[in-house]
């Protein structure tokens, strides 16, 4: 594609050093640049892509997209925001692939990963070839790849959508993070259904205030329904029990489907009960009601199921199809995942890393425990420090014993993070133990547990690494827990 043909899709730019070269690839990593590439200079938190423009040209870049003039001998496309320009141009370069997919986007603080997984599994049960983009992995049909971010950069995202289209995928569920929405990574994505799970405190290190965080999430609904196509009606699926839904309701032009358990909603759950294999309840919808059995547990998972069911109903699936598929839905790795080595107590690994998600997990654990509840919990470094005392307060309030430890401290001092946590529970000093080393903390909890107890290891879930300083070391809560049980005998 000629450079100027590609740029015709982009508003507001100026080209320094004229020319109209052929563009055969788009790249944002200078190490991947080859002859004929269009290289995007992106500003990161620690690295500025503008510093790698000369390297990109030396590797064969035919043109550069940048936010400031550069001394290179190829056309430089000057824009106000390289990330947003990349999203627009990637969508155009790859042929607007989302226009050929049924695309469901899920946003919210908690529940995105499980909700998208349920949606994808329901669609797959109907015989559709599906795709999934999220925190744990990216799936294209039956193949999966590790995910670097909850929502990839737009270039990777559109490249993945193009791959999905080429391989016959027709239905995609994806997580949409507030960072991705704020940075314009999903600009150009043509969503058919947008789903809101909930909004609680998280990512204030990035957004600054809850209002800004709320507004960023709302961008998904603001762009929904902007392109009318009677053959592809669009829907917003909102959690009626979360008051933020009232705000999002006024941000979208699309029809709204509500779900909930407390407020009267379009999609609801009634007669919820725990079973030996999970949960059972009555799924009530405008299309009638159906009995549902699921391997998932916890009220938070009822919400995830309701969100997924509402999205699938809006996508045209029948109630009977959805109810039947829910019986076979498998839990997501690291989301309330049980570690079973034959011990006479329960070990659960969960990704809960916000005060709200930790509270929900501990409330569910309390229902399962015959005796004491232990929780191993830490807080991530270089992230919102204001939630650290809140996490600690939740831990000591709902567990019999809380063990404070490291999560991913990143560039911060792990001991300072723990001091921030301890500051929230000074009046309840007897209910917690601080063990900075995460492996030791897990071993301590498992060593203390007796028959009928539950040990909840929270915060990292599916992650198989720990970030300490600039080092990424191999670490898996589940593997550590298994080893601790075996050593205990």
Swiss-Prot record:
UDP-N-acetyl-alpha-D-muramoyl-L-alanyl-D-glutamate binds at residues 30, 149-151, 177, 183, 185. Keywords: ATP-binding, Cell cycle, Cell division, Cell shape, Cell wall biogenesis/degradation, Cytoplasm, Ligase, Magnesium, Nucleotide-binding, Peptidoglycan synthesis. Carboxylation is probably crucial for Mg(2+) binding and, consequently, for the gamma-phosphate positioning of ATP. GO terms for cellular component: cytoplasm. The modification N6-carboxylysine is found at residue 217. Its EC number is 6.3.2.13. It comes from the Bacteria. Meso-2,6-diaminopimelate binds at residues 383, 407-410, 459, 463. ATP binds at residues 108-114. GO terms for biological process: cell division; cell wall organization; peptidoglycan biosynthetic process; regulation of cell shape. This is UDP-N-acetylmuramoyl-L-alanyl-D-glutamate--2,6-diaminopimelate ligase. It comes from Geobacillus kaustophilus (strain HTA426). The gene is murE.
